[in-house]
């Protein structure tokens, strides 16, 4: 059942905090893989199922009727994020008229329910625990930084400078190839304005930015 209110969603998220993955999976009749090598998205799927998310990988938010996106965030023993966070695929073509205000990235990040999860590899997957939920909305200053990065990165795409894009660009957002392998090509714009085959690119939040969100929450300013 999909939660009908923000309060109901938060209550569900708080109810699973502290559970081991094995306990939660068992209650949902989901098998636990031995590790995440072949099942990279399993943790996200486990949490989505537990909370009743509906969108899957569609462009809309996970809880579209509440205007909330769901993100699992693996952290280490010190409470620091272990990986970057995928936000959405970048539009490599037909991006005329796309602005920050009507972008998928802004839409997805307008309100996020972060679910912290233990992510250290030495902890067996079944023994890892679900952590606290954090309901977050970007501050005006955070949105400004996101917008600045998004506009800079989109400029590279629209000007056909795909080969110049690398993971060092952007202070809080980065663009990286998104695909299981290099055979998963899509269409993009080349440097002379021609259509080319290229790797799909995804927008990711840097670990430093998600660490800042966690810090904000711990200090009670989030």
From Swiss-Prot:
NCBIfam families cross-referenced by the UniProt entry: mutH_TIGR (TIGR02248), PRK05070.1 (NF003458)
Ribonucleoprotein listed as a keyword: no
Organism: Pasteurella multocida (strain Pm70)
One GO-annotated biological process of the protein: DNA modification
Organism placement in taxonomy: Bacteria, Pseudomonadati, Pseudomonadota, Gammaproteobacteria, Pasteurellales
Entry protein name: DNA mismatch repair protein MutH
UniProt similarity note: Belongs to the MutH family.
Gene3D superfamilies referenced in this protein's UniProt entry, alphabetically: DNA mismatch repair MutH/Restriction endonuclease, type II
GO cellular component labels: cytoplasm
Any one GO MF annotation of this record: endonuclease activity
Protein role: Sequence-specific endonuclease that cleaves unmethylated GATC sequences. It is involved in DNA mismatch repair.
Superkingdom classification of source: Bacteria
Alphabetical keyword list: Cytoplasm, DNA damage, DNA repair, Endonuclease, Hydrolase, Nuclease
Record's subcellular location: Cytoplasm
Protein biosynthesis listed as a keyword: no
CDD domains: MutH-like (cd00583)
One Pfam family it belongs to: MutH
């Amino acid at each position: 059942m999909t939660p009908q209110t923000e309060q109901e969603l938060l209550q569900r998220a708080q109810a699973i905090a502290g559970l081991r993955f094995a306990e939660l999976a068992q209650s949902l009749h989901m098998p636990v893989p031995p590790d995440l090598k072949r099942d990279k998205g399993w943790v996200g799927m486990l949490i989505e199922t537990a909370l009743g998310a509906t969108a899957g990988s569609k462009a809309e938010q996970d809880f579209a009727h509440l205007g909330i996106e769901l993100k699992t965030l693996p952290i280490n023993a010190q409470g620091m994020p272990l990986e970057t966070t995928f936000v959405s695929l970048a539009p490599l073509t037909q991006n005329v008229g796309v602005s920050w205000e009507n972008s998928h990235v802004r839409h997805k990040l307008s309100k996020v329910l972060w679910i912290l999860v233990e992510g250290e590899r030495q902890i067996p997957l079944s023994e890892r625990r679900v952590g606290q939920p954090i309901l977050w909305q970007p501050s005006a200053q955070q949105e400004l930084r996101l917008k600045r990065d998004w506009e800079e990165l989109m400029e590279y795409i629209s000007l056909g400078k795909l080969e110049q894009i690398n993971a060092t660009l952007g202070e809080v957002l980065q663009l990286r190839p998104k695909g299981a392998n290099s055979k998963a090509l899509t269409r993009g714009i080349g440097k002379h304005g021609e259509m080319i085959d290229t790797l799909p690119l995804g927008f990711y939040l840097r670990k430093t930015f998600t660490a800042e969100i966690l810090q904000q929450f711990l200090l009670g300013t989030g």
